UniProtKB/Swiss-Prot annotation:
GO aspect biological process, one term: fatty acid biosynthetic process
Pfam family membership, one: Carboxyl_trans
Localization (cell): Cytoplasm
Cofactor(s) essential for the protein: Zn(2+)
The enzyme's E.C. designation: 2.1.3.15
Protein name: Acetyl-coenzyme A carboxylase carboxyl transferase subunit beta
Pathway participation: Lipid metabolism; malonyl-CoA biosynthesis; malonyl-CoA from acetyl-CoA: step 1/1
Major subcellular location class: cytoplasm
Residues the entry annotates as binding Zn(2+): C37, C40, C55, C58
Protein family per UniProt: Belongs to the AccD/PCCB family.
């Protein structure tokens, strides 16, 4: 009779007992660290885009904020903002509109979809307007219309050229007919500025569409555009469904507009300050 029993050389696992594994934390990559280029679809490290926000692979021109535009365009420290504090009265009492405005102000740091003021660009004093598509797609409401109108009126009195960077998804639907009347209102101010013999330069940026395109964006004495910018009135699908025809692949791109005479020149972002200053000087310069 054996005094000692032979031990098994393996361990027994109860199949009915659940084995819980500790969840492993997944590495998190901040959303703002990388961007996908809409042009070539490359994933790009944000720092590789540089301050100009240009794709290093295909030279696609990314959209930028009004603050970024100021930093790239004007002489440092020369911007003096005008017409701040104007607020929409929400004429239609559109549901959720005031909440939307408050959210956009907090998110963008802007009060409205356009920044207006005066600045020096390579030593030339200009009345400057910059529309920012980050604010409700830079849609044109009563405040946008009022600020741009006042900019032209101020420039007319002070005998300044106007430089306007346009970007917009069109009229602001939350303000109805009040937003549409801004087209005529701004155009009248543009005409008075022109009658005074003053220079108006527009730079079309991505996207410039709707009522903005149908009015002051295309009324400049000279019209420039950034590369590959979308510029048009109605959307591509709306037009195709209306005319029952397929449109060219590059339809409504800045290059297409240049080819058909709607734009005077396409200028790379890095070249815009020098180009703007040269055109202002060519048209008499600024009085200051």
């Amino acid at each position: 009779m054996a005094l000692f029993s032979k031990k098994d050389k393996y361990i027994r696992i109860n199949p009915n007992r659940s084995v819980r594994e500790k969840p492993q934390a997944k590495p998190e990559v901040p959303d703002e660290l990388f961007s996908q280029c809409p042009g070539c679809k490359h994933t790009i490290y944000q720092k590789d885009l540089g301050s100009e926000r240009i794709c290093p692979h295909c030279s696609y021109t990314f959209r930028i904020s009004a603050q970024e535009r100021l930093a790239l365009t004007i002489d440092m420290g020369t911007f003096k903002e005008l017409f701040t504090g104007i607020e929409s009265k929400d004429p239609l009492h559109f549901p959720g509109y005031q909440k939307k405005l408050a959210s956009m102000r907090e998110k963008t740091g802007l009060h409205e979809a356009v920044v207006t003021g005066t600045a020096l660009i390579k030593g030339q004093t200009v009345a400057l307007g910059i529309m920012d598509s980050n604010f409700i797609m830079a849609s044109m409401g009563t405040v946008v219309g009022e600020k741009i109108t006042r900019l032209f009126e101020y420039a007319t009195v002070e005998k300044l050229p106007v430089v306007l960077f346009t970007a917009s998804g069109g009229a602001r639907m939350q303000e109805g007919i009040m937003s549409l009347m801004q087209m005529a209102k701004i155009s009248a101010a543009v005409k008075r500025h022109s009658n005074a013999g003053l220079f108006y330069l527009t730079i079309l940026t991505d996207p410039t569409t709707g009522g903005v395109t149908a009015s002051f964006a295309m009324e400049g004495d000279i019209i420039l555009a950034e590369p590959q910018s979308l510029v048009g009135f109605a959307g591509r699908r709306v037009i195709e469904n209306t005319v029952r025809e397929s449109l060219p692949e590059d339809f409504q791109k800045a290059e297409f507009l240049l080819e058909h005479g709607f734009v005077d020149a396409i200028v790379k972002r890095r070249d815009l300050p020098d180009t703007i200053a040269s055109l202002v000087r060519l048209h008499g310069g600024s009085p200051r």
